[in-house]
Amino acid sequence: MVPFFDKTQTVDQANALPGRTTPMPVATLNVVTDHSMTQVPDGLEVAIFAMGCFWGVERLFWQQQGVYSTAAGYSGGYTPNPTYREVCSGQTGHTEVVRVVFDPKIISYKQLLQVFWENHDPAQGMRQGGDVGTQYRSAIYTLTPEQQTEAESSLQRFQQAMEQAGDKRAITTEVAPALPFYYAEDDHQQYLYKNPEGYCGLGGIGVCLPPQG
């Protein structure tokens, strides 16, 4: 008998799928921005966010002025070079993420954090709306100590704003230094540009991120 696997419980490393050594083939260019999905030009920076299904999350960020490129992928887990099917099984430890390459002279990391907090529900644990599983958990994966500090500060401010709005739930967003990022299959890249009527479960809770004091 195959044991039941609870997709709302994060797998540990010993029980994660083995994955593979070969990276996922990835298109050279983002079809929306016409910029590279893999290269980061001098002066630009990278952010990684998880807000549920990455289709809508990627569209949200490519719409922001100052965002150079975006890519859908997987991070936060153990399985190297996972497939979408493997991530959806809950046995990789990964969550669906979007890698955002941005120009800090046009849009700051703080502004990206505001987009993050105000456009999903960060207090749902291992789900986002009707999408249930560890791959839909909310997360901010930081690339620098400065990003880590800003992300932690923003979480505290948004928690206070939720409480002031009468929402007493605890934020479940994971804030942690980034583990390796793995590109999703090409079908998932810029999905809602290629499929304008496709599914998007993204939505905020009506709370705004207060400015830093």
From Swiss-Prot:
SUPFAM superfamilies: Peptide methionine sulfoxide reductase (SSF55068)
Gene3D superfamilies, A to Z: Peptide methionine sulphoxide reductase MsrA (3.30.1060.10)
Catalytic activity: L-methionyl-[protein] + [thioredoxin]-disulfide + H2O = L-methionyl-(S)-S-oxide-[protein] + [thioredoxin]-dithiol; [thioredoxin]-disulfide + L-methionine + H2O = L-methionine (S)-S-oxide + [thioredoxin]-dithiol
A biological-process GO annotation: cellular response to oxidative stress
Domain of life from the UniProt record: Bacteria
Similarity field: Belongs to the MsrA Met sulfoxide reductase family.
Biological function: Has an important function as a repair enzyme for proteins that have been inactivated by oxidation. Catalyzes the reversible oxidation-reduction of methionine sulfoxide in proteins to methionine.
Stated name of the protein: Peptide methionine sulfoxide reductase MsrA
Organism (species): Serratia proteamaculans (strain 568)
Lineage, top ranks: Bacteria, Pseudomonadati, Pseudomonadota, Gammaproteobacteria, Enterobacterales
